[in-house]
């Protein structure tokens, strides 16, 4: 449904008269079948499967007659790859000198985007910060009156609009960027927190714990940054809702009641009394180069104005520490989106438009 909406909206935006039925379902199926096949090894950036994917995209753009932006279709993306050695690492919550080591995978997932061989956190106090959002345009600041430096921010996924369904509150049921896990880690880093625990909940996250466990286990990829990730949170983590319930009970807090309070702009952060986080993460660090793949079609009237259409081409690749079928093919995430983008690009390659069209298949970092 989302893909169909994207296709129809793209037709409206560009003001084309050609019939929608030129978008061929058979082509979508063909691209998905190829990109999600075992031959493409899960399309991990920097892997053989990733290289094969990039070549496939380039070839398809060439078949359409869409030129590259400059010289080549590849736009270089330098990558850092960090893999936590779970045998040598731990994450624990302590109450009254009694540590609870959270099981990696079944109770928590944790990693660091700092490009170092190891990070550690000692006796970091836990504080519940609602949704962990600072959004001046909505009159919202979950960190108000709080110095979170050196502390561990515990927060909910998504934003308050999801629960209230009030279209005037953020974007109602539809998630804004403030609701995404990426934003939450970024904002906590700006606030000076040392670690973050995001509480998983299937409905607002839009995926079950199994997806969290799979996505954040093993190798984590980030853009190779000038500061080597020093501006990032030391420890980024998710915990299950069951673990969260236990922790709030340990702190004599009612999580359900606090969730309701966190739906209002006057919410005030709450110290999780007596709870501290300790962690030691041992990292294996590697670097590689991958690419976004892009093509462009010039507009006839306003060539310096661009309509951007994009989809990420990558997925999880191969989980080398797993036995059996360890290829994460990613048919839905995101061979389907990439296929839709290719079919849109093919359609518009034969259509004259006032503005230029930039087609970008990227690695979302």
For the regions a language model picked out, list residue spans one by one.
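Structural recognition of the beta-strand scaffold that forms the well-ordered cores
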Residues: 33-36, 126-129, 152-156, 195-199, ...
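A conserved hydrophobic secondary-structure block that centers on an alpha-helix together
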Residues: 131-213, 304
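N-terminal hydrophobic or amphipathic helices/low-complexity stretches enriched
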Residues: 16-68, 79, 88-89, 209, ...
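Acidic/histidine-rich catalytic neighborhood of metal-dependent amide-processing enzymes
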Residues: 173, 177-179, 204, 317, ...
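Soluble metallo-hydrolase cores and metallopeptidase-like ectodomains found primarily
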Residues: 94-96, 108-145, 227-330, 346-350, ...
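Noncatalytic luminal/extracellular "stalk/propeptide" segments of secretory-pathway proteins
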Residues: 41-167, 271-273, 281, 290
């Amino acid at each position: 449904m989302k893909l169909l909406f994207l296709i129809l909206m793209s037709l409206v935006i560009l003001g084309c008269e050609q019939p929608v039925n030129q978008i061929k379902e058979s082509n979508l199926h063909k691209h998905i079948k190829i990109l999600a096949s075992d031959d493409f090894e899960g399309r991990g950036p920097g892997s053989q499967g990733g290289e094969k994917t990039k070549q496939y995209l380039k070839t398809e753009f060439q078949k359409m007659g869409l030129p590259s932006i400059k010289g080549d279709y590849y736009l270089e993306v330098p990558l850092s790859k960090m893999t936590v050695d779970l045998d040598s690492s731990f994450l624990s919550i302590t109450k009254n000198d009694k540590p609870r080591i959270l099981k990696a995978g079944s109770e928590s997932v944790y990693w660091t985007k700092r490009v170092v061989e190891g990070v550690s956190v000692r006796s970091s106090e836990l504080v519940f910060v609602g949704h962990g959002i600072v959004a001046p345009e909505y009159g919202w600041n979950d960190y108000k009156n709080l110095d979170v430096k050196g502390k561990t921010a515990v927060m909910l996924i998504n934003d308050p609009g999801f629960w209230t369904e009030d279209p005037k509150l953020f974007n109602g049921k539809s998630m804004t960027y403030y609701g995404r896990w990426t934003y939450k880690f970024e904002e906590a880093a700006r606030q000076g927190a040392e670690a973050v625990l995001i509480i998983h909940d299937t409905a607002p996250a839009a995926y079950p714990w199994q997806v969290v466990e799979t996505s954040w286990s093993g190798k984590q990829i980030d853009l190779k940054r000038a500061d080597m990730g020093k501006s990032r949170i030391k420890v980024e983590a998710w915990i299950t809702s069951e673990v969260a319930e236990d922790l709030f009970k340990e702190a004599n807090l009612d999580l359900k009641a606090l969730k309701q309070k966190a739906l209002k702009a006057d919410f005030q952060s709450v110290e999780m009394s007596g709870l501290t986080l300790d962690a030691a993460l041992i990292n294996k660090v590697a670097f590689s180069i991958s690419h976004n793949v892009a093509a462009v079609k010039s507009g006839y009237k306003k060539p310096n104005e661009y309509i951007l259409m994009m989809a990420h081409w990558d997925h999880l690749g191969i989980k080398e520490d797993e036995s059996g079928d360890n290829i994460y093919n990613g048919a839905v995430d995101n061979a389907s989106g990439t296929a839709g983008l290719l079919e849109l690009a093919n359609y518009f390659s034969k259509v004259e438009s006032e503005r230029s069209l930039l087609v970008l298949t990227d690695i979302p970092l």
